[in-house]
C-alpha cells in the first residue's frame, strides 16, 4: 500500500529550484544552515540548476571541496544542471521580469536550445565523474543578461541568456569560449545537429 506526504508536511518544506554559490564562505554558510529556510525544512529534490559565480569556479581547491561536500551529502540531485555567471545577484534581479522562477527559466533555456542535445550540458553528476577520471572536456554554460555589460537591469526585455561557455578540463575551469566554439565541440561529441 502507498503512503504520501500529508498536507502539513509539504507546507513545512521549502523546495528550491536554484542554488547560487558565490564564494567558499557563502557556500559553507548556506550549506551549514541548509536544513531550514526560515521555519521550513529545505528539500533539494526539485533543484534544477546550480549557479556558480565564475570567480569561485576558478578556485580549483575550493571547488574541489564544494564538490566533495555535495557528493558526500547526497542531498543535491546529480542531475541538477551546472551553470556559471559573473554575478548571481545581477541575474536574480531579472526574476521579476520572468514568467517563472529563475531556476526553472534557466533549466528551460538549456532544454529548449535548438540543435543541442541536453546531454551536452553538464550536471553535478558529470562534474563529480570528471573530478575522478579527468578524461572529458565539459562546457559549462555562462549566463549573462544579453545586451548588458554592467550595472543594474533596467530594460524589461532583457533576460538571462547563454552568452559563452566555461571550459571545464581535467577537473578545473580553463577559460571562456564563445557559443560557436562550444557548438562545434558539441557537434564533434555528437551532441549537436549540423
Annotated model-derived regions:
Residues 1-194:
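Membrane-proximal alpha-helical signals and transmembrane carboxylates
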Amino acid at each position: 500500500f502507498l503512503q504520501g506526504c500529508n498536507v502539513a508536511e509539504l507546507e513545512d518544506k521549502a523546495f528550491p529550484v536554484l542554488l547560487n554559490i558565490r564564494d567558499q564562505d557563502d557556500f559553507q554558510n548556506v550549506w551549514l544552515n541548509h536544513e531550514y529556510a526560515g521555519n521550513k525544512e529545505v528539500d533539494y529534490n526539485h533543484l534544477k540548476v546550480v549557479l556558480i559565480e565564475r570567480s569561485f569556479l576558478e578556485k580549483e581547491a575550493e571547488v574541489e571541496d564544494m564538490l566533495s561536500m555535495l557528493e558526500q551529502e547526497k542531498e543535491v540531485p546529480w542531475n541538477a544542471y551546472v551553470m556559471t555567471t559573473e554575478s548571481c545577484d545581477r541575474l536574480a534581479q531579472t526574476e521579476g521580469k520572468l514568467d517563472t522562477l529563475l531556476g526553472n527559466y534557466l533549466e528551460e533555456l538549456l532544454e529548449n536550445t535548438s540543435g543541442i542535445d541536453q546531454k551536452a550540458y553538464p550536471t553535478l553528476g558529470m562534474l563529480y565523474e570528471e573530478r575522478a577520471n579527468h578524461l572529458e572536456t565539459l562546457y559549462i554554460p555562462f549566463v549573462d543578461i544579453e545586451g548588458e555589460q554592467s550595472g543594474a537591469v533596467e530594460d524589461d526585455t532583457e533576460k538571462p541568456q547563454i552568452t559563452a561557455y566555461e571550459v571545464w578540463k581535467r577537473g578545473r575551469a580553463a577559460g571562456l569560449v564563445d557559443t560557436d566554439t562550444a557548438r562545434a565541440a558539441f557537434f564533434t561529441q555528437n551532441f549537436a545537429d549540423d
